[in-house]
Amino acid sequence: MAYTRSKIVDLVDGKIDPDTLHQMLSTPKDPERFVTYVEILQERMPWDDKIILPLGPKLFIVQQKVSKKWTVRCECGHDFCDWKDNWKLSARVHVRDTPQKMEEIYPRLMAPTPSWQVIREYFCPECGTLHDVEAPTPWYPVIHDFSPDIEGFYQEWLGLPVPERADA
């Protein structure tokens, strides 16, 4: 079932009714939905570079207009790093690793024990948007969420040509 552009706008804005949302999530995707979704996001960005793949509500892999280089970018326009790198290593990080810091977000007796678990909050260094939160053991390295197979996604799933990339 193909959804109207206005329904996808409602989805992006978080204004879609629960029944339609459930139906959208549980049924096969219509072929043009991703393109429409990206067009809607693109219109809302303060920059002209092409969105290749949304990574989160305000985090994207983009193709820089002039160089054709792919980077991870915040909605505000801050480029974190090359698309293949872990963007979290270029983010501003707040680590909650003391009882006092944990109690800022948890009730006292419900907070994790900092010697067993820390909370890492990853922010855009330019606009301060919170992009991700991890809750690993204190010694665990920064988690690289995933490395998308953009070529496979575009060619095999969407049936679209892969956008040009400078380092391809």
Curated annotation (Swiss-Prot):
<comment type="subunit">
    <text>Heterohexamer of two alpha, two beta and two gamma subunits.</text>
</comment>
<keyword id="KW-0067">ATP-binding</keyword>
<keyword id="KW-0547">Nucleotide-binding</keyword>
<dbReference type="GO" id="GO:0018710">
    <property type="term" value="F:acetone carboxylase activity"/>
</dbReference>
<comment type="function">
    <text>Catalyzes the carboxylation of acetone to form acetoacetate. Has a reduced activity on butanone, and no activity on 2-pentatone, 3-pentatone, 2-hexanone, chloroacetone, pyruvate, phosphoenolpyruvate, acetaldehyde, propionaldehyde and propylene oxide.</text>
</comment>
<keyword id="KW-0436">Ligase</keyword>
<protein>
    <recommendedName>
        <fullName>Acetone carboxylase gamma subunit</fullName>
        <ecNumber>6.4.1.6</ecNumber>
    </recommendedName>
</protein>
<dbReference type="InterPro" id="IPR016750">
    <property type="entry name" value="Aceto_COase_bsu/gsu"/>
</dbReference>
<dbReference type="GO" id="GO:0005524">
    <property type="term" value="F:ATP binding"/>
</dbReference>
<dbReference type="Pfam" id="PF08882">
    <property type="entry name" value="Acetone_carb_G"/>
</dbReference>
<dbReference type="GO" id="GO:0140977">
    <property type="term" value="P:cellular detoxification of acetone"/>
</dbReference>
